[in-house]
Amino acid sequence: MLVQVICGRRDAAEAADSLQELERLADTAGIEVAGQLTQRRPRPDGATLLGAGKLADLRTACEDRGANHVLFDNELNAVQAYNLTKALERRVFDRTEAILQIFARRARSSEAQTQVELAQLEFLLSRIPVLEAQQRFKGGIGMRGPGESHLQLRNAPMRRRIADLRQRLAAIQARQRRSRAKRPWPVVSLVGYTNAGKSTLLNALAGADAYVDDRLFATLDTKTRLVRLGEGRQILLTDTVGFIRHLPHGLVASFRSTLDVACQADLLLVVVDASHPRVQDHVDVCRATLDEIGAGGVPSLLVLNKCDLPAAAETATHAAERHPLAIPVSAHSGLGLDTLRLAVAEELKR
């Protein structure tokens, strides 16, 4: 069951889009959605987020539909997660944990696996009492990947492991920065909202075959390809993990070495899906995340991808009006790619 509590004056359309995104996260995590439940409240209940009546409705709905998991769009603190687990007698988790689950499944390189393990352990450190309660209920998806073997650890050993992982990632980041300092070509980094088509754009510009999947967070590891802009100019184009609303701060911190490529780039291509009805929200999320990782000052171009889709006819027009320098493209059909190459070349001359 998917659950969302809408508090205060939160925009209804934005909340609906967030819930739809949560459903896609569930699908990516391999969870079948049995139904949805929403509640609007002036403020969240400190103990269970939901009101008592709605909590009873949720338990009944889970029983009627055979739902073994309850996924909240809202971030749950440890107390709320513990109380909800006891009240519902089911596996309860939130958007943050769902994203961690997806990252654990998608991590391939040693660096990505180390970053996922760090994020998992920092999350588990705050949830040990909740996990003990949840272990009494069967059918949970649980934490998978490197963090799983640490469920029984307690604070001191876990903190030592976290410190070790941070040190390891700091060494990776330092090594990567030294390597980038020797690069023979300018580096342009593809950043943007998850599932905006960054990997497809990388393939289209570089004539490459990077992995592409119509699911959230298909890319965790940084991929770099050589791209020819014309007139003898070449760049290194990188593609890295996508952004999403409410991306956990701990996850951003854990993936610092991967996201550092954006901070060190000569130019950023901020890619969003022009066919999405709330494309401006995605632009705002991207800008905020870039600020958070320290890349807000890097020169950038806004790229409106998927402009060939029928749904983009109106949304892309509005986005272009708000961002007159944005470049509409279609990585799938090739529309606008020559214009994008020229824009990149001109920007790098400055």
Task: Outline where the language-model segments fall.
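N-terminal accessory targeting/assembly segments
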Residues: 1-95, 99-100
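Charged, low-hydrophobicity low-complexity segments
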Residues: 3, 8, 18-21, 25-28, ...
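G-domain G4 guanine-recognition motif of GTPases
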Residues: 5-8, 38-43, 47, 149, ...
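Flexible beta-alpha connector loops of hexameric P-loop NTPases
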Residues: 9-14, 44-48, 106-110, 150, ...
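Conserved C-terminal guanine-recognition region of P-loop GTPase G domains, centered on the G4
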Residues: 19-27, 59-64, 76-90, 232-233, ...
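Residue-level signature of catalytic and energy-coupling elements of molecular machines
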Residues: 22, 70, 121, 158, ...
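Canonical P-loop GTPase G-domain recognition
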Residues: 89-139, 298-301, 308-350
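Conserved G1/Walker A P-loop phosphate-binding module
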Residues: 131, 135-252, 259-263, 267
